[in-house]
């Protein structure tokens, strides 16, 4: 999948059919006698069934056949959604339950996405990178290889205005928990961002920054490496 620029994302969202996907549990006396709309996936037995489809299609169908159902329960998690969730089945990475990843996201081999992470359209995650619990990668956020994005960290997204630059995190970067990296910031290779930092300016390669706003503390040294080294065993599949 090619990297999406802001205008491509805007076009994708603007032209995509807006859908309200629902799952409908039904009970009746003779469900197999019903003819379901072609757009609906129907898994029915004689007296019970489950229907998958768009509410715009299923709502009138259920109303028309109200007398055929003894009970109906509707579940839905989105309304007029333009971007579905990413199909994870063939992604060569470890993705834990509860992560929310939208379509048009690139995830490199052996990456790790932890519970509660949210990754928006157009984001890219490099090989062997870990996105920790509750981290948020906004639209078009770019993260290189073998990074660690700490729990609760926010990499601000940029979809509009279309001319804005995304957050760019180079290879081998460690960002501590609950840090914020604002739009357009470039964090250089091997840098370390301390927990809770708010990064408003570019970070030079192999430097340590901390504070609000984040400021240069020192160059990465052996002591820093000993405290921030990543564990490759966590990235094995």
From Swiss-Prot:
Entry EC no(s): 2.3.1.89
Catalytic activity: (S)-2,3,4,5-tetrahydrodipicolinate + acetyl-CoA + H2O = L-2-acetamido-6-oxoheptanedioate + CoA
InterPro entries documented for this protein: DapH (IPR019873), DapH_N (IPR013710), Hexapep (IPR001451), Hexapep_transf_CS (IPR018357), Trans_hexapeptide_repeat (IPR050179), Trimer_LpxA-like_sf (IPR011004)
Keyword Lyase: no
Domain of life: Bacteria
Keywords recorded for this protein, A-Z: Acyltransferase, Amino-acid biosynthesis, Diaminopimelate biosynthesis, Lysine biosynthesis, Repeat, Transferase
Gene3D superfamilies: Hexapeptide repeat proteins, Malonyl-CoA ACP transacylase, ACP-binding
Pfam families in the cross-refs: DapH_N (PF08503), Hexapep (PF00132), Hexapep_2 (PF14602)
GO biological process terms on file: diaminopimelate biosynthetic process; lysine biosynthetic process via diaminopimelate
Annotated metabolic or biological route of this protein: Amino-acid biosynthesis; L-lysine biosynthesis via DAP pathway; LL-2,6-diaminopimelate from (S)-tetrahydrodipicolinate (acetylase route): step 1/3
Enzyme class: transferase
GO molecular function: tetrahydrodipicolinate N-acetyltransferase activity
Family: Belongs to the transferase hexapeptide repeat family. DapH subfamily.
Function: Catalyzes the transfer of an acetyl group from acetyl-CoA to tetrahydrodipicolinate.
Protein name: 2,3,4,5-tetrahydropyridine-2,6-dicarboxylate N-acetyltransferase
């Amino acid at each position: 999948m090619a990297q999406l620029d802001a205008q491509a994302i805007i076009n994708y969202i603007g032209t995509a059919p807006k859908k309200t996907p629902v799952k409908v549990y039904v009970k009746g006396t003779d469900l197999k006698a019903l003819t379901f709309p072609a757009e609906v996936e129907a898994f029915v037995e004689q007296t019970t069934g489950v229907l998958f489809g768009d509410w715009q299609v299923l709502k009138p169908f259920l109303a028309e056949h109200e007398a055929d159902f003894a009970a109906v329960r509707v579940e839905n998690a989105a309304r007029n959604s333009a971007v579905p969730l990413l199909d994870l089945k063939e992604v060569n990475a470890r993705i834990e339950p509860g992560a929310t990843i939208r379509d048009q996201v690139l995830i490199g081999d052996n990456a790790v996405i932890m519970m509660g992470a949210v990754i928006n359209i157009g984001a890219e995650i490099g090989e062997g990178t870990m996105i920790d619990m509750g981290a948020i990668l906004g639209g078009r956020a770019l993260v290189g290889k073998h990074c660690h994005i700490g729990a609760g960290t926010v990499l601000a997204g940029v979809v509009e205005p279309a001319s804005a630059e995304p957050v760019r995190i180079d290879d081998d970067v460690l960002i501590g928990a609950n840090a914020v990296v604002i739009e357009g910031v470039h964090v250089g290779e091997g840098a370390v961002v301390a927990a809770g930092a708010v990064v408003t300016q570019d970070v030079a390669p192999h430097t340590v920054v901390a504070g609000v706003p984040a400021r240069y503390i020192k160059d990465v040294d052996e002591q820093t490496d000993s405290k921030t080294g990543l564990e490759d065993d966590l990235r094995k599949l």
